């Protein structure tokens, strides 16, 4: 199971969890709003195999005026933990693309004190001024249901910057990504990767020299 696959599992679980509680895609659409993923941190102890049964747990951790945080745990059928994840979401007006205020009272009813023992997403240093960018243009297959650059596609294209042989001998322990602006079909991008410390890479996707995400 790859990191992008896990990213898709997390987003689908978040969508289902929200939908069952009255603040999913359809409910938000009726209010002319939509959830936007702002930050994501995934930390894996080990990766499931293709034959492992995965139990995925998700819960709301905090609710603020503009952002809500959601946690995840991936475990096998015997309860052994594969990894945890933390995410931060904002609700935006679909017309103006601006943040809208969250209903703290309504969402707050679903806050769970379940522990998520990994660090919250932190500051990510820019990579675009440390490394030449590889050009890429957003294509139809990169788009989500709203016609914007899919959150997991950011991750896929950043991982494509690595030599495939590295994935045969090593695994990513932690991925942290900050989504800074939306991408649309045909938008020209540059993808950047620079080593910031042993076993740590800073990455960025930029449009016209400005980062639309950092990882």
Question: Where are each of the predicted segments found?
Answer:
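Alpha-helix C-terminal capping segments
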Residues: 162, 193-194
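Short coil/loop residues immediately preceding or within conserved phosphate-binding loops
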Residues: 39, 69, 140, 174, ...
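Small beta-barrel nucleic-acid-binding modules, principally OB-folds
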Residues: 32-47, 170-182
């Amino acid at each position: 199971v790859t990191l992008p696959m896990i990213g898709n599992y997390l987003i689908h679980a978040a969508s289902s969890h929200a939908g069952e509680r009255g603040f999913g895609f359809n409910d938000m659409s009726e209010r002319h709003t939509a959830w936007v993923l702002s930050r994501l941190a995934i930390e894996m102890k080990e990766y499931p195999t293709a034959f492992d049964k995965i139990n995925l747990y998700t819960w709301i951790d905090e609710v603020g005026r503009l952002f809500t945080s959601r946690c995840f745990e991936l475990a096998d059928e015997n309860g052994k933990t594969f990894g945890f994840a933390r995410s931060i979401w904002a609700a935006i007006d679909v017309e103006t693309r601006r943040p809208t205020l969250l209903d703290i009272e309504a969402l707050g009813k679903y806050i769970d004190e379940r522990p998520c023992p990994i660090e919250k997403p932190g500051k990510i240093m820019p990579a675009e001024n440390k490394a030449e960018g590889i050009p890429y243009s957003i294509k139809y297959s990169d788009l989500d249901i709203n016609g914007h650059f899919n959150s997991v596609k950011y991750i896929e294209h950043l991982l494509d910057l690595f030599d495939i042989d590295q994935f045969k001998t090593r695994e990513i322990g932690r991925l942290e990504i900050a989504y800074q602006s939306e991408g649309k079909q045909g938008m020209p991008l540059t993808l950047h990767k620079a080593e910031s410390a042993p076993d740590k890479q800073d990455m960025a996707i930029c449009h016209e020299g400005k980062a639309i995400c950092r990882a």
